[in-house]
Amino acid sequence: MIEDDLIISAHDEVAIRQRLLLVAMGREPADLAIEVGRLLAVHANHWMENQEIVISGRRIAYVGPLGSYRGTVAKRVSYPQLSAVPGFGEVHKHIESTHLTPEYEAALVLPRGNTWTCEASHEFANVDGTRNTEFWQKARLAGSPLKIFIQPGSAVPPSAWEESGGYYGYDEQKQFLRDDLSVTGLDEVMDWPSVWDPDNPGYARMWGMIRATFEMRGVVEGHGSGLVDPHDISAFAAAGLSSDHEVWALDEAWDDPK
């Protein structure tokens, strides 16, 4: 196991994968095997009975019928009365809005099966600026099992008429995505006029962040509260905004997915 794989680089990820595949083949020893009564195959919508999960470091290397793994294992534990399912996750959350630090968030959600969260950080980003990722990673580096995938906020500052403790534009967003694999994209683009109106003073900054995200193959998350006209909804999608979690009215919940 590479000791610093809680926050990984592309270089470390390659080294981890190179060893992991050998463990999966039984050519290198595994650290742990967990035997369970059944395991949920999510994509097949099917329960598989009497399975074993083989672990190397912090990664799953092998899953198969009980006793099928052909390699050596340092330790085996058996829980025939339990079922195993992949960890639940939250694709959009503001831990910052709870006033909890990441380790306290982990203590609340991990016992309920939540193993990862996409932190949509714009509130705290307006305070700590480009050091935002450092804050979210600190608990993870200290050993917290909760994975936090960071999405720098598009609203830093919230509008062109405001100033804050941070400024994110093309350069900042590209550096976030280039330097850190835990950064997955751009957080909720919510200043809709700065997306569609070239005369809006926030237009260049917003599209700079979107461009940087596209260049680094990230995901651009949307925030389209109040968009009910089909022209606006179509324009929202045409801009490359891939999601919308902000639905306030029943007609929005029905019209937006259509």
Residue map of PLM features:
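Di-metal (Zn2+ and/or Mg2+/Mn2+) metal-binding site signature of metallo-dependent hydrolases
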Residues: L82-Y104
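Hydrophobic alpha-helical scaffolding
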Residues: I95, H122-N126, E162-E163, H223-G226, ...
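Hydrophobic alpha-helical bundles that form the membrane domains of multi-pass transporters
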Residues: G26, A33, V54, H94, ...
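Active-site core of metal-dependent hydrolases
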Residues: P193-K258
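Histidine-rich, glycine-flanked metal-binding segment
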Residues: D4-L32, R38-V85
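Active-site environment of divalent metal-dependent phosphoester hydrolases
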Residues: E96-T98, F124-V127, V156-P158, W192-S194, ...
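Divalent metal-coordination and catalytic microenvironments
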Residues: G37, I53, R58, Q81, ...
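Divalent-metal coordination cores built from histidine and acidic residues
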Residues: I2-A24, E28-P29, S78-Y79, S83-A84, ...
